[in-house]
């Protein structure tokens, strides 16, 4: 997610300068270093220690969200955290407590909030053209099989964390 989605977005944004990337997969890391002409690290903590970073994007497997985010906060670095915030509520509360203690900025990325279809639904609901809403239903018309870490409950949280985080967030956002 990070190297294929967030890195191009950072590079194409005039307000950001990509200085380094971290990935334990040496092949992916080497490819990213060559493609984006940046420093690369196989260890996120080493990157945070050696680079002068204002912000890190934590797009690691979900079971690393807590330690990577806490590591950034401890080093005085703000965090843009890929959803879900954590695999468990206790971890999310620990992240929030660390954010409050350190005063660092934290943004949990919920990309579907800013998609055009969501904005259109938001405007329609705000217009009250439909009257009082009693139910919102969201369906998936297709599903992809995950064979990587995201499919495993202990690493990615399984389907609920992959898709459910989007659906629950949208319901909260729209209501």
Spans of model-derived segments:
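Predominantly a Rossmann-like dinucleotide-binding segment in NAD(P)-dependent oxidoreductases
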Residues: 112-175
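Alpha-helical elements of Rossmann-like donor-binding domains used by nucleotide-donor carbohydrate transfer enzymes
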Residues: 5, 31, 46, 55, ...
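N-terminal Rossmann-like dinucleotide-binding module
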Residues: 1-36
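Conserved SAM-binding strand-loop segment of SAM-dependent methyltransferases
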Residues: 37-46
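Short active-site oxyanion
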Residues: 16-20, 54-56, 158-159
């Amino acid at each position: 997610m990070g190297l294929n989605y967030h890195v191009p977005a950072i590079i194409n944004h005039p307000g950001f300068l990509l200085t380094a990337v971290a990935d334990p997969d040496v092949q992916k890391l080497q490819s990213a270093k060559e493609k984006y002409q940046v420093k690369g690290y196989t260890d996120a903590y080493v990157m945070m220690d050696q680079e002068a970073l204002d912000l890190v994007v934590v797009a690691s497997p979900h079971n690393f969200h807590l330690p990577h985010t806490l590591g950034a906060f401890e080093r005085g670095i703000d965090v843009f955290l890929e959803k879900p915030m954590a695999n468990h509520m206790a971890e999310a509360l620990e992240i929030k407590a660390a954010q409050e203690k350190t005063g660092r900025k934290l943004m949990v990325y919920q990309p579907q909030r800013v998609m055009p279809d969501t904005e259109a639904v938001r405007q329609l609901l705000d217009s009250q053209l439909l009257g009082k809403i009693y139910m919102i239903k969201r369906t998936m018309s297709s599903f992809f099989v995950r064979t990587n870490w995201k499919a495993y409950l202990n690493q990615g949280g399984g389907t609920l964390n992959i898709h459910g985080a989007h659906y629950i967030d949208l319901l909260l956002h729209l209501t």
